[in-house]
Every structure is written in C-alpha cells, then in structure tokens.
Amino acid sequence: MAASIATRLAPVAIFVIVAGFFAVALRSGDPSRLPSPLIGKPAPQAAFPALDGLLAEGKTVPGFATADLAKGKVSIVNFWASWCAPCVDEHPMLAELKMSAGVDVYGVAYKDDGAASRRFLGRYGNPFTAVGADDSGRRGIDWGVYGTPETFVVNGRGEIVFKHVGPMTAESIKLKMLPAIAAAKNSSAQKS
C-alpha cells in the first residue's frame, strides 16, 4: 500500500518541481529584454511596402527597406499595431525618443489592417520617418518579433544593436534606449 501511494504521488511531485522551475525562470530577468540572436548582426533583408493611402502634409508616407537602415545614421525600428493596447501607451514615447535622440524612427504596421493603421496614426500622430506594412507578419518573423510593440536600435551600418520588447516607458528610454543609441552612435563614429 505504501508503494501505491508513492507511485501515485510521484507524478504530482515531478509536476510541482517542474512548475517551480518555470515559476523561478519567469520571475527572473527583465521581460522587456528577450535575448535576440540578431544582436550584432545585419538587420534581416526585407522591404516594407508603404502603408496604402497614408499621407503626411499631402504627400505619401514612404515604406522602407533594410538598405535604408545602413546609410550611416543610427535608427529605430518599431513594430506596432492598431489593435495593440500597449502601442497606444508607447506611441507618444516614440516622438519623444525621435526628438531627444535625434534618430529616424521607422514604423512597421505588424499584422494589421491598413485602414485601421491609418486611423491609429490619424488619432495618435505619426512620429515615423517611414511606415511599412507587414500584413502577414512574415517579415517580422525574420526580425525575431514575438508580438507588439517591439523596438530595435540599428546602428549606421545596418546592424541590430539592441532590442526592447514591450512598450517603452520614460524609464526604459532613459535607462536602456538612450544608452543603446549613444553606444551605436559612438560605434558608428569610430568605424567611419
């Protein structure tokens, strides 16, 4: 009888131990900084077509390609969507980051409807230098995007140097994004 109780409790004990390991792993580390195998490597080759019908000052807002990110200037690439509630909270931070850091900010409407993306930018403003569409999410997969928002710092050579997962806050901009941008600018200046 003692053996049958031990036999029945063994799977429960194993489950509790494994669940404990997962709980510890989930609580440790910064969830906004998932490791990316792309750090230090060239941004994946992709062309993000312009968001149909998006205008700024009467002119079509262009899409962009990876080559646009390798023209000697540090830039930011932000994957967002109109259906993403944290993207609404983060959106004003993008304009602030563009101004304070003096970088171009490229936006990717990720797995989003074009009309909904245009309404979002009409309502909250357009901080982007260019806005590309990734309707299917295939290009985002190449970039290692898990969801929205996700933001990348790309150095002047077109290499990804930092990835931020989740919405940026004033604190994350100050403690993470601005130092990553400064390091990328210094690195680009030294290689010139």
Where in this protein do the model-derived segments appear?
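Conserved segment of the thioredoxin-like fold in thiol-based oxidoreductases
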Residues: M99-S136
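Thiol/disulfide oxidoreductase modules built on the thioredoxin-like
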Residues: R8, G122-P127, A133-K185, K191-S192
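Conserved redox-active cysteine motifs that mediate thiol-disulfide chemistry
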Residues: F79-E96
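Solvent-exposed loop/turn segments at secondary-structure junctions
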Residues: A81-A85, K111-A115, G137-R139, P167-A170
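Hydrophobic beta-strand anchors of alpha/beta hydrolase catalytic cores
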Residues: I76-V77, V105, T151
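N-terminal targeting signals for export/organelle localization
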Residues: M1-L54, S192
